[in-house]
Amino acid sequence: MIRASIRARHLAFASTLALGALSAPVAAQDVAEANDDAEGVAAEDAGGIVVTARRREENLLDVPIAVTAYGAEALEESGSLDITDIGDTTPNVTIENSRATNSTLSAFIRGVGQQDPVGGFEAGVGIYLDDVYLNRPQAAVLDIYDVERIEVLRGPQGTLYGRNTIGGAIKYVTRRLPDEFEAKVRATYGTYDQAEAVVSLAVPLGDMFKFGASGARLSRGGFGDNLNLGIENYNKDVWAGRASIEFETPDDRLLVRISGDYTHDKSNPRNGHRLIPGALSGAPVLDNVFDTRAGLTVPAQDIKAYGLMMNIAAELSDNFTLRSISAWREDKSYVPIDFDALPTVDVDVPGIYFNDQTSQELQLLYSSDRLNGLVGFYYLEANALTQFDVILATTGPLIGVPLGANFGQFTSGDVNTETWSAFGDFTFDFTDWLSVSAGIRYTKDNRRSEILKANRLGLPSPEFGGAGVNLGAPITDFTGEASFEKWTPRVSVSLKPTEDLLVYASYSQGFKGGGFDPRGSANITPNTDGVAGPPSYAEIYDFFLFEPETVDSYEVGIKGSLFDRAFTYALTGFYADYTNVQIPGSVGVDANGDGIFEGFAGVTTNAGKARFKGVEAELFARVARDFAGPGSQITLAGTAGYIDAEYREYIAIIGGVETNLAPFRGVQNTPKFTASATLGADLPVGPGDLSANVTLSHRSRTQHFEIANPYLDQPAYQLLDAGVTYRWADDRFSLGVYGKNLTNERYITSGYPFIATNATTGVPVLANGTPVPSLGREGALTAFYGNPRQVFVSGTVKF
């Protein structure tokens, strides 16, 4: 059994890095391991790869979508710690922590995503936890434990997944409970005092009930230090847990699964590294990019996220299954963000994010010999409250306010979303080799926003435990409502000449919801009605409003295998036209034109048009087999992505004139080339199996914002990872050693660029060779870096 299962296990790992399970069983992995002979495993390899990209279980070779899937053992053997780790080996995908946080996710697929996590902006990539859509990116950096698989769907998924999947979707699927008693303990220790423990328990309660729970303690020392506050920077301090109860009838026709999860992140604030000396204080640039001098301590950083879910699947007949997905979620984040990363109170931003959501989805699935599909209904009600100060104490004296008065602005954006949709998608097999799929979704989106912005003295504000008071009347006191509706179809044609070959072409639409910029400043509203005086409500409404972003996407692909699945491949080409592209921006405000930036505002525009086109390849080859005994093998996996992403129209008002800035703007967080290569080996050693792998990944130059920044943009770089895992006693015991970023590469993942630039070209404005601040007086140009070299040992015991 051990010798047979080694091949299935490593193939599952190879699929992670190559074909997203094309080359190995992911969902069927456990079945393969139950076989006692190598031929049984090979048969399982050939046809047991299951994903749920189209909201129903299907063999990956039958799915006309670009999908990459990561199984639980594959994630373990690669040393993956959280959901961001899969970005290195998925083509045309960027997944990272959002700037100054450990837990807020920034995800981009094929050039589409969300940089700014402020409530009111919609993500372009949908994140799903057990089929529940996470409406906000806070607390969406999901740690990897108790997981069955992660699926990455590239390209618009508007028909089956709805709004805000215009770039794609990432599905995190937790593990179903086993039929027998199981207890498991995993412990990890590594560099930077990384210490982790995960304890899982599953208990059958009679013939039809099961209970399971997992608890995780995830901690790590800082990669650097806050030299001002005397605390660690980039540390990790997380407690998390999940529990579930399952009811399943003996005939398997009814399954009810109720689950809950809780995460508490008590990590220190993650503060950035200054890229230029302080313009006012003269503070030098620090040598260690993970060190900081940030001084803001209000509010005390604390992040909690929790939720309840109930999934019901009832088989009504041989052809019909009814599925219900109910969920409630809430998260609360208190974050002190020091934009300038100095002890000086120059651009300090205490912030809170409160999010809650309730959702209900119903699906009726139909299955027959030639027609398969589903119809469904989805409802979501969500609220996102974002409040923050922008403390500009050093700017105060320039406008007659003493330095110690802590001048600045308070902003509150309260956004309520109510959306519902109805959808259907069916596939008809005209012959054994020709299938046509068609689907459509109707979505009605209702948004209500309440936005308050006021100059204040004595910051922080009372919302953060301070004593700030308004200085004059509020700058913004706005309430607005808007409704949007959209039909999003999808059509595909699939040709399957053989069981191991799929050729497909598809057309789909997607959209990202509109709304109002929750950081808007009414005092910079353009005069569009020709009436002198303060702006009217209609002018403010139009200025704050941004329309939905839409896409028409075309894709062709081929998936297949050769030589008894010794070589597998997936090739995809795509072309996408975007209209009303949403560009959220943060700018310093000089309301009276005196050259002093005395405020901060968000300005979101529908820039115009963009075109993205590219290709993706995922390959896997078993280059040697049974060379050192049954089950031994050497494998080579590779991924590659190329994308040509450009704005074709980017309209802005420059000097009162509409100007097309497309030649001077780029697509953020979208490197032109991404690639990875993994060499793997499986060997029977003593009483167990040894699996080893080495992965080299590459990303070309990355522009972090639409405006190129020579200080912040990241040149091309490579990362080297490796792992060795040994399992024995029928997989009851395992021990592994893993290394991430073994060459200790320093690379920027995000930052804050509050420096003055030419309005048209975006070239930084310099004074004596140094960038001129556009907010505050120090020059807030700070960067956040990817993790340095980490090496850790992990052991698992199953009882």
Segment roles from a protein language model:
Residues 118-121, 177-182, 205-209, 250-253, ...:
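Short loop/turn motifs that connect adjacent beta-strands in outer-membrane beta-barrel proteins
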Residues 697-705, 726-799:
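C-terminal beta-signal and adjacent terminal beta-strands/loops
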Residues 311-315, 321-337, 496, 502-508, ...:
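Membrane-embedded beta-barrel scaffold of Gram-negative outer-membrane proteins
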Residues 372, 432, 436, 566-578, ...:
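Gram-negative outer-membrane beta-barrel transporters
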Residues 178-180, 188, 200-297, 331-345, ...:
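Periplasmic-side early beta-strands and strand-to-turn transitions of outer-membrane beta-barrels
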Residues 1-78, 83-90, 202, 256, ...:
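N-terminal Sec signal peptide and the immediately downstream disordered periplasmic leader
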Residues 122-124, 136, 145-154, 159-227, ...:
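Outer-membrane beta-barrel translocator/receptor signature
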